[in-house]
Amino acid sequence: MKTYLETFDNGPGGWFGWIDNARGPKPLERGESTVISRSPWWIDYNHAPPGAGYMHLLFMLLTSGYPGENQREVSGENQFTKGGFGTDFTNAELTLRLKGELRSLDTQLYLLIQGVHKGVCTGWILTGQPINVTTEWSEQRITAGTDESQWTCLGSRHDRSDFYGRTPLKTVLSDVNANILLVLYPLDIAPMGPLNGDPHVLRPEKDYPVWRSRLPEGYVMLDEVRIEKS
Protein backbone atom coordinates (compact mmCIF):
# COMPACT_ATOMS: atom_id res chain seq x y z
CA MET A 1 0.00 0.00 0.00
CA LYS A 2 1.38 3.39 -1.02
CA THR A 3 0.51 6.39 1.14
CA TYR A 4 0.52 10.07 0.22
CA LEU A 5 0.75 12.43 3.18
CA GLU A 6 0.66 16.21 3.00
CA THR A 7 0.97 18.15 6.26
CA PHE A 8 1.55 21.61 4.73
CA ASP A 9 4.56 22.14 6.99
CA ASN A 10 6.64 23.35 4.03
CA GLY A 11 4.03 25.13 1.96
CA PRO A 12 0.92 24.22 -0.05
CA GLY A 13 2.56 21.15 -1.60
CA GLY A 14 0.73 21.58 -4.90
CA TRP A 15 -2.69 22.48 -3.48
CA PHE A 16 -4.38 25.66 -4.72
CA GLY A 17 -7.64 27.57 -5.09
CA TRP A 18 -9.42 28.88 -8.18
CA ILE A 19 -10.35 32.39 -9.30
CA ASP A 20 -12.58 31.67 -12.30
CA ASN A 21 -12.53 30.22 -15.83
CA ALA A 22 -10.69 33.22 -17.26
CA ARG A 23 -8.03 33.72 -14.58
CA GLY A 24 -7.41 30.20 -13.33
CA PRO A 25 -5.56 29.14 -10.18
CA LYS A 26 -4.93 31.25 -7.09
CA PRO A 27 -2.85 30.66 -3.96
CA LEU A 28 -4.56 29.39 -0.84
CA GLU A 29 -4.18 31.36 2.36
CA ARG A 30 -1.47 30.03 4.63
CA GLY A 31 -1.77 29.31 8.33
CA GLU A 32 0.57 27.49 10.70
CA SER A 33 1.09 24.19 8.83
CA THR A 34 -2.32 24.67 7.20
CA VAL A 35 -3.90 25.99 4.03
CA ILE A 36 -7.12 27.98 4.16
CA SER A 37 -9.93 28.52 1.68
CA ARG A 38 -12.16 31.50 2.41
CA SER A 39 -15.33 32.90 0.85
CA PRO A 40 -16.46 34.49 -1.38
CA TRP A 41 -15.91 31.61 -3.78
CA TRP A 42 -16.42 31.60 -7.54
CA ILE A 43 -19.57 29.92 -8.86
CA ASP A 44 -18.44 27.07 -11.12
CA TYR A 45 -21.08 27.05 -13.86
CA ASN A 46 -19.32 24.55 -16.17
CA HIS A 47 -21.82 21.86 -15.16
CA ALA A 48 -25.03 23.91 -15.07
CA PRO A 49 -28.20 22.01 -16.06
CA PRO A 50 -28.52 19.82 -18.05
CA GLY A 51 -25.39 18.97 -16.06
CA ALA A 52 -25.44 18.23 -12.33
CA GLY A 53 -25.42 21.86 -11.21
CA TYR A 54 -23.25 24.53 -9.61
CA MET A 55 -20.49 24.34 -7.01
CA HIS A 56 -17.68 26.18 -5.23
CA LEU A 57 -14.10 24.93 -5.66
CA LEU A 58 -12.26 25.19 -2.33
CA PHE A 59 -9.13 23.06 -2.67
CA MET A 60 -7.54 21.54 -5.79
CA LEU A 61 -4.58 19.26 -6.53
CA LEU A 62 -3.26 18.25 -9.95
CA THR A 63 -2.67 14.50 -10.12
CA SER A 64 -0.47 14.27 -13.22
CA GLY A 65 1.59 16.33 -15.64
CA TYR A 66 4.31 18.91 -15.23
CA PRO A 67 3.03 22.27 -13.97
CA GLY A 68 4.34 25.44 -15.55
CA GLU A 69 5.98 28.37 -13.83
CA ASN A 70 2.74 30.13 -12.90
CA GLN A 71 1.23 26.98 -11.42
CA ARG A 72 4.36 26.34 -9.35
CA GLU A 73 4.34 29.90 -8.05
CA VAL A 74 0.69 29.56 -7.06
CA SER A 75 0.72 26.11 -5.50
CA GLY A 76 4.35 25.28 -4.73
CA GLU A 77 5.99 22.00 -5.65
CA ASN A 78 3.42 19.27 -6.20
CA GLN A 79 4.41 16.55 -3.74
CA PHE A 80 1.80 14.15 -5.15
CA THR A 81 3.19 14.05 -8.68
CA LYS A 82 6.78 14.37 -7.45
CA GLY A 83 6.25 11.31 -5.25
CA GLY A 84 4.92 9.25 -8.15
CA PHE A 85 1.71 8.28 -6.36
CA GLY A 86 -0.07 7.52 -9.62
CA THR A 87 -3.58 8.20 -10.86
CA ASP A 88 -5.40 4.98 -9.89
CA PHE A 89 -7.76 5.97 -7.08
CA THR A 90 -9.87 2.81 -7.11
CA ASN A 91 -10.89 2.12 -3.49
CA ALA A 92 -8.40 4.71 -2.24
CA GLU A 93 -8.97 5.84 1.35
CA LEU A 94 -8.68 9.57 1.98
CA THR A 95 -8.32 11.01 5.47
CA LEU A 96 -8.62 14.76 5.93
CA ARG A 97 -7.81 16.71 9.09
CA LEU A 98 -9.73 19.95 8.89
CA LYS A 99 -11.86 22.50 10.68
CA GLY A 100 -13.66 25.73 9.87
CA GLU A 101 -16.61 28.00 10.33
CA LEU A 102 -19.03 27.45 7.51
CA ARG A 103 -22.48 28.78 6.80
CA SER A 104 -23.07 25.93 4.40
CA LEU A 105 -26.82 26.34 3.87
CA ASP A 106 -27.94 23.30 1.85
CA THR A 107 -24.48 22.44 0.54
CA GLN A 108 -21.93 19.95 1.82
CA LEU A 109 -18.21 19.47 1.30
CA TYR A 110 -17.39 16.61 -1.05
CA LEU A 111 -14.52 14.99 -2.90
CA LEU A 112 -14.52 15.54 -6.67
CA ILE A 113 -12.32 13.50 -9.01
CA GLN A 114 -11.69 14.39 -12.66
CA GLY A 115 -10.07 12.50 -15.50
CA VAL A 116 -9.74 12.98 -19.26
CA HIS A 117 -10.38 9.91 -21.42
CA LYS A 118 -10.76 9.90 -25.21
CA GLY A 119 -10.85 13.68 -25.14
CA VAL A 120 -13.68 13.89 -22.60
CA CYS A 121 -13.19 15.34 -19.12
CA THR A 122 -15.46 13.61 -16.62
CA GLY A 123 -16.06 14.69 -13.06
CA TRP A 124 -17.57 12.47 -10.36
CA ILE A 125 -18.53 13.86 -6.92
CA LEU A 126 -18.60 11.44 -3.98
CA THR A 127 -22.03 12.65 -2.82
CA GLY A 128 -22.65 9.52 -0.77
CA GLN A 129 -19.87 10.46 1.66
CA PRO A 130 -20.05 14.12 2.74
CA ILE A 131 -17.10 15.59 4.62
CA ASN A 132 -18.08 17.24 7.89
CA VAL A 133 -16.58 20.63 8.73
CA THR A 134 -16.63 21.43 12.44
CA THR A 135 -15.23 24.31 14.49
CA GLU A 136 -12.72 21.96 16.14
CA TRP A 137 -10.15 19.79 14.39
CA SER A 138 -11.51 16.46 13.22
CA GLU A 139 -10.40 13.65 10.95
CA GLN A 140 -12.81 12.71 8.18
CA ARG A 141 -12.32 9.50 6.22
CA ILE A 142 -13.87 8.67 2.86
CA THR A 143 -13.37 5.80 0.42
CA ALA A 144 -13.37 6.17 -3.36
CA GLY A 145 -15.26 2.96 -4.09
CA THR A 146 -16.72 1.82 -7.41
CA ASP A 147 -20.42 1.90 -6.46
CA GLU A 148 -21.93 4.54 -8.76
CA SER A 149 -24.84 5.07 -6.37
CA GLN A 150 -22.34 6.81 -4.06
CA TRP A 151 -21.35 9.27 -6.77
CA THR A 152 -22.85 12.00 -8.96
CA CYS A 153 -21.51 12.56 -12.48
CA LEU A 154 -21.16 16.26 -13.26
CA GLY A 155 -21.87 16.16 -16.98
CA SER A 156 -21.79 19.49 -18.82
CA ARG A 157 -23.61 22.77 -19.30
CA HIS A 158 -25.24 23.27 -22.70
CA ASP A 159 -22.17 24.70 -24.45
CA ARG A 160 -19.30 22.71 -22.88
CA SER A 161 -20.13 19.21 -24.11
CA ASP A 162 -17.16 19.43 -26.48
CA PHE A 163 -14.97 19.04 -23.37
CA TYR A 164 -17.05 17.78 -20.43
CA GLY A 165 -19.11 14.60 -20.48
CA ARG A 166 -19.65 11.22 -18.91
CA THR A 167 -17.12 8.40 -18.77
CA PRO A 168 -17.89 5.35 -16.59
CA LEU A 169 -16.86 5.76 -12.95
CA LYS A 170 -14.57 2.73 -12.95
CA THR A 171 -12.66 4.14 -15.92
CA VAL A 172 -12.17 7.51 -14.25
CA LEU A 173 -11.26 6.00 -10.87
CA SER A 174 -8.60 3.85 -12.52
CA ASP A 175 -6.99 6.95 -14.04
CA VAL A 176 -7.78 10.23 -12.28
CA ASN A 177 -5.34 12.04 -14.54
CA ALA A 178 -6.64 15.61 -14.15
CA ASN A 179 -7.18 16.57 -10.53
CA ILE A 180 -8.91 15.99 -7.22
CA LEU A 181 -10.86 18.72 -5.46
CA LEU A 182 -12.83 19.51 -2.34
CA VAL A 183 -16.02 21.30 -3.37
CA LEU A 184 -19.19 22.73 -1.85
CA TYR A 185 -22.20 21.34 -3.70
CA PRO A 186 -24.96 21.89 -4.76
CA LEU A 187 -25.38 25.66 -4.88
CA ASP A 188 -28.71 27.46 -4.88
CA ILE A 189 -28.38 30.02 -7.67
CA ALA A 190 -30.98 32.78 -7.31
CA PRO A 191 -30.88 35.56 -9.94
CA MET A 192 -31.08 39.07 -8.52
CA GLY A 193 -33.82 40.66 -10.58
CA PRO A 194 -35.46 39.72 -13.88
CA LEU A 195 -33.49 37.90 -16.57
CA ASN A 196 -33.65 38.11 -20.32
CA GLY A 197 -32.92 34.46 -20.97
CA ASP A 198 -32.45 31.04 -19.39
CA PRO A 199 -30.41 31.27 -16.14
CA HIS A 200 -28.67 27.99 -16.99
CA VAL A 201 -27.70 29.18 -20.47
CA LEU A 202 -26.47 32.46 -19.04
CA ARG A 203 -23.59 32.41 -16.56
CA PRO A 204 -24.19 33.47 -12.94
CA GLU A 205 -22.13 36.47 -11.78
CA LYS A 206 -20.79 36.86 -15.31
CA ASP A 207 -24.00 37.45 -17.27
CA TYR A 208 -26.29 38.27 -14.34
CA PRO A 209 -26.05 39.05 -10.59
CA VAL A 210 -27.14 36.56 -7.95
CA TRP A 211 -28.27 36.73 -4.33
CA ARG A 212 -25.06 35.94 -2.46
CA SER A 213 -27.13 35.44 0.70
CA ARG A 214 -28.26 32.13 -0.81
CA LEU A 215 -24.67 30.91 -1.13
CA PRO A 216 -22.26 29.41 1.45
CA GLU A 217 -19.78 31.60 3.26
CA GLY A 218 -17.02 31.08 5.77
CA TYR A 219 -13.67 29.36 5.72
CA VAL A 220 -12.16 25.88 5.84
CA MET A 221 -8.68 25.09 7.19
CA LEU A 222 -6.93 21.97 5.91
CA ASP A 223 -4.17 20.60 8.13
CA GLU A 224 -3.45 17.16 6.69
CA VAL A 225 -4.37 15.03 3.69
CA ARG A 226 -3.62 11.31 3.67
CA ILE A 227 -4.37 9.08 0.66
CA GLU A 228 -3.86 5.34 1.05
CA LYS A 229 -3.91 3.22 -2.08
CA SER A 230 -3.91 -0.54 -2.26
Where are these regions (language model features)?
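Beta-rich carbohydrate-recognition modules and glycan-binding surfaces
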Residues: M1-S230
